[in-house]
Amino acid sequence: MKGNVIVTPDFKRDVKKLLKKYPSLKSDLARLAADLFLNPKMGTQLSAHVYKIRLAIKSKGKGKSGGARVISYVDILTIEESDVYLLTIYDKSEFENISDKKLKELIQRIEDDLSDI
């Protein structure tokens, strides 16, 4: 399955903060985007379309377990193609997990946007 990777405004805002702390994050995210293109459903499935991806931040030097978490939403278009929306990113050392409330808000926003298309 192949997919397109689409960055949401929430993700842009969150990644901007982390880029100031971790200079390698830009290249780490480029590798993630390439991986998502080939395997849109990577990570731990949180709900029908939502996945949590563990991302190692090279400049942080702690591997995947101490890196960042990326929340993605996979919109399946055909059997062979899907769009992957990057909803948010957070530093594992700042937040253990994303709250259910915030996750529901992010999912609702993307589903509202998709229904408008």
PLM regions and their residue ranges:
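Compact soluble domain cores
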Residues: 24-42
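Arg/Lys-rich, positively charged N-terminal/basic patches that mediate binding to nucleic acids
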Residues: 1-29
